Amino acid sequence: MPHFSLKKHTDHSIIFEGNYASLKDCLEHAVERNISLSHVNLKNHNLTNANIDNADMPYADLSGTNLTGANLSEADISNALFHNCGLYNTCLSESNLKNSDFRGASFGATLINGANLRGCVFSTLSACDLDFQHAADMFFCQYITTEGDHYNMSNPPIVIKGLLNVPIIIFDDIIKIGSKTLSKTNMPQISHILSFYTHKIIT
């Protein structure tokens, strides 16, 4: 079998190594043995359906990694990079994801119930569909637009689709309609517009 090693992305030192059928098998064995994988470099790997629950890998770099169907429940993945990561059908339940960066990450049927998301950063529309209502903590979360605007997201965003030709997203302090941003002080005016369109659809 080929030789695989798990290295830190900071100084490239080897954390764990051995002969395995795949890097995923190497990672799963390291997690099974309770090896600390702090700062592990897992960038641009295919970890589809990986079973790494209870993993100890704060500050991990998972940028560009395919984590579709992976089980990362009850893990410490705080301060990690999830840039452009695929997280479809991924289980992050009960995990510590505090201060992790999810810019560019794609979500779909992603489980985050009981997860600590305090201070996390998001940027994709699919992130707004996450079930934040059942997360343990999402205080100080931020949503960053493609234009570089930062929106506070300490509460679950409200997403309205199908009413206009662009989604309407209500964040803590602002309302985003497509590329336009409005203050929540405009809510009465927006409510009137939405009421008009709703009535138009019904009739």
Q: At which residue positions do the language-model features occur?
A:
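Short, surface-exposed loop and linker segments with low hydrophobicity and enrichment for Pro/Ser/Thr
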Residues: 1-2, 29
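GIY-YIG-like beta-to-alpha core
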Residues: 11
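Tandem repeat scaffolds
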Residues: 14, 18-203
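A short beta-strand micro-motif
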Residues: 3-8
